[in-house]
Amino acid sequence: MPIEGKYKLEKSDNFDKFLDELGVGFMVKTAAKTLKPTLEVDVQGDTYVFRSLSTFKNTEIKFKLGEEFEEDRADGKRVKTVVNKEGDNKFIQTQYGDKEVKIVRDFQGDDVVVTASVGDVTSVRTYKRI
């Protein structure tokens, strides 16, 4: 099944602790916890585009597998990032900076399970295709 499409956040576990460990400020954390963002995935040849859309903030990363790029992390810091693919449907994103963050997006049919880790804190968020 192709991964392109739109997915809505259905379930979020431990996301507030993940944001705490990352050092996200109170106002941003409060807003982020209450939102139900839409994940939009687009594939343009060998370039992938992942967008997170919400009423509070929209973000986008555009990348080619294995190629380093820069992005603004959730705490506002500019970091170097690399995304690799494992199998057909699992994308492993590593953000390098003062803290290393790993974000795994596992596309499972109509669901995307996003596991984000920083330090010894892990958050799991599940999105459903819309």
From Swiss-Prot:
GO terms for cellular component: cytoplasm. SUPFAM superfamilies: Lipocalins (SSF50814). Coiled coil: none annotated. CDD domains: FABP_Der_p_13-like. GO terms for molecular function: lipid binding. It is found in: Cytoplasm. InterPro entries: Calycin, Fatty_acid-bd, ILBP, Lipocln_cytosolic_FA-bd_dom. It comes from the Eukaryota. Keywords: Allergen, Cytoplasm, Lipid-binding, Transport. (9Z)-octadecenoate binds at residues 105, 125-127. Pfam families: Lipocalin (PF00061). The keyword Cytoplasm applies. (5Z,8Z,11Z,14Z)-eicosatetraenoate binds at residues 105, 125-127. FABPs are thought to play a role in the intracellular transport of long-chain fatty acids and their acyl-CoA esters. Binds the natural fluorescent fatty acid cis-parinaric acid and oleic acid by competition, but not retinol, retinoic acid, cholesterol, dansylated or anthroxylated fatty acids such as dansyl-DL-aminocaprylic acid and 12-(9-anthroyloxy)-stereate. Belongs to the calycin superfamily. Fatty-acid binding protein (FABP) family. Forms a beta-barrel structure that accommodates hydrophobic ligands in its interior. This is Fatty acid-binding protein. It comes from Blomia tropicalis (Mite).
